């Protein structure tokens, strides 16, 4: 039996984006193609990737295999990628996008986000790709004076050229959204942010939704992904999977903690992009829409908010995006 369709959000440009996607961050290159292919077979249609993840070739292979086998068409797949920090200069934006399109083996991406509001020094693709934190000077961070609006204007041109269907931003605070609105011709369709019970960001999410921007949550399970990276802050934070509040709500609804965490975001009108290597979890992570959290559940989860951010550029080089 075919998997049931995933509900979609209508973006402010009229296009539809699945409300549940498959996150490609930290997908191992040796297994990424198979994982993406299996996720498509399990009913996933949105794949959230990025230049910085270093696995877009493999993601593209998984998508291509599914298309070649007739499981899906390109039009049924929603591919998200993100412009990395080294490519913010308008003259480098299309170069970076073309690399993504080549790696994904497609003519366009459905959504292209500015990954962070940070402009590093340009590093040629042939020198190092993805460059990560490399700025051409050993371990030193080197920045370029590129206003966000200039980068945005370059993305708008690529929408008009047909290489991108929707554009948006990631890791932007409200003040930068306001600044972007002053000069943007195309409004951001999506805002992607870290979002979990320890970092609920209610005002930012309320504002984005009020002005017609769809919000996508990453790291819906809180410290989990960062524990796997041995991040000290995450290692010293109680896992949400074992938190008494989350476990009690899960038991009440006969669900597992992951389903509660994803359902909590969904009921806030937020898209989610979990990932899993396990086939049974692939199904579980996209089937949380069959129950409702109560007002009391929400009140209990809201008490867990401690404004604890795990993905903070301040940790890189004292970059003050969220201070």
From Swiss-Prot:
Its EC number is 1.1.1.307. It catalyses: xylitol + NAD(+) = D-xylose + NADH + H(+); xylitol + NADP(+) = D-xylose + NADPH + H(+). The keyword Heme does not apply. CDD domains: AKR_AKR2B1-10. The record marks 82 as: Lowers pKa of active site Tyr. One of its GO terms (biological process) is D-xylose catabolic process. It is an enzyme of class 1 (oxidoreductase). The active site is at residue 53. It comes from the Eukaryota. Pathway: Carbohydrate metabolism; D-xylose degradation. Belongs to the aldo/keto reductase family. PANTHER family: ALDO/KETO REDUCTASE. This is NAD(P)H-dependent D-xylose reductase.
């Amino acid at each position: 039996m075919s998997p049931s369709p995933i509900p979609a959000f209508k973006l402010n440009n009229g296009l539809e984006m699945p409300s549940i996607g498959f996150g490609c961050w930290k997908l191992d290159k040796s297994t990424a193609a198979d994982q993406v292919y299996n996720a498509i077979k399990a009913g996933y249609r949105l794949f959230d990737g990025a230049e910085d993840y270093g696995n877009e070739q493999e993601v593209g292979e998984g998508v291509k295999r599914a298309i070649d086998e007739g499981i899906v068409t390109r039009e049924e797949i929603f591919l998200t990628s993100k412009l990395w920090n080294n490519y913010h200069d308008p003259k480098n934006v299309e170069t970076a996008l073309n690399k993504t399109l080549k790696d994904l083996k497609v003519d366009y991406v459905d959504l292209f986000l500015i990954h962070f509001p940070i402009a590093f020094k340009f590093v040629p693709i042939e020198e190092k790709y993805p460059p990560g934190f490399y700025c051409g000077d050993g371990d030193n961070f080197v920045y370029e004076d590129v206003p966000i609006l200039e980068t945005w204007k370059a993305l708008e041109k690529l929408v008009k050229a047909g290489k991108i269907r929707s554009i948006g931003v990631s890791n932007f605070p409200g003040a930068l959204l306001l600044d972007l609105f002053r000069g943007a011709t195309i409004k951001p369709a999506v805002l992607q942010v870290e979002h979990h019970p320890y970092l609920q960001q209610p005002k930012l999410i309320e504002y984005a939704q009020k002005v017609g921007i769809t919000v996508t949550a990453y790291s819906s399970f809180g410290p989990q992904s960062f524990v796997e990276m041995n991040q000290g802050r995450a290692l010293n934070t109680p896992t949400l999977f074992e938190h008494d509040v989350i476990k009690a709500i899960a038991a009440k609804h006969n669900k597992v903690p992951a389903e509660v965490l994803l359902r909590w975001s969904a009921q806030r009108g937020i898209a989610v992009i979990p990932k899993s290597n396990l086939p049974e979890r692939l199904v579980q992570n996209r089937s949380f829409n069959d129950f409702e959290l109560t007002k009391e559940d929400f009140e209990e989860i809201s008490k867990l908010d401690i404004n604890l951010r795990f993905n903070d550029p301040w940790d890189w080089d004292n970059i003050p995006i969220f201070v």
